[in-house]
């Protein structure tokens, strides 16, 4: 188990002190709703996405999307309706975009084009390969969006945006290990106003700030399964108990919730309960 100073703290306690507004919002939601389950909805039609989000909504803290695989995507029929479901059920939206280009390019990818991700995704993620410029570009887009919305004088609730860095992946043979992971943590440390966590298999080594306090990184872990070991395409599954005990804060589950022969409501409850039980055992 990780020796992290954060690992035994309740989500509600961490929500009071976290350096990121987006992370504070997520931690409070998780505590209030008693769930650390993120539903990874890798489906290819808007109808599938919205149906699953509605069925799983009561049991999750977050929906993870790959919006660019939606074959019939339109902003009004896909995004607007997904955001409405997020409000209905009380979950956040994480667009798993995995940005990986220079700062100016990712700024435009995040804010413009067909998807306009910054307008609706509370959270997105990025590779650290391009260096710090990728974080700066995404942060600029987020800040410009927030300022433009405030200038309109409309609803300003939940405008904050947060970034997660890809520190480790769950696929077999992943190159995101060792020095890559270490450098990714360094980048996050230098940009903790915007970066609040990692996609990782284990808890990241913590860094003390100038006042001697340890930074609090949220760890989101994919490749979690209660039944399967893998998928034949390199995905490797680990148990809920294992990832939570190793310091993960959010378990990301996809096909385990809605794969062939699975009832999303039944599986949503099962994974929610398993994740919460493992978390309570960790903090007690």
Curated annotation (Swiss-Prot):
Keywords (A to Z) from UniProt: Decarboxylase, Lyase, Pyrimidine biosynthesis
Active site: 98
GO molecular function: orotidine-5'-phosphate decarboxylase activity
GO cellular component, one term: cytosol
EC code: 4.1.1.23
Protein name per UniProt: Orotidine 5'-phosphate decarboxylase
Keyword Lyase: yes
Organism encoding this protein: Magnusiomyces magnusii (Yeast)
Pathway info: Pyrimidine metabolism; UMP biosynthesis via de novo pathway; UMP from orotate: step 2/2
A GO biological-process term: 'de novo' UMP biosynthetic process
CDD domains reported for this sequence: OMP_decarboxylase_like
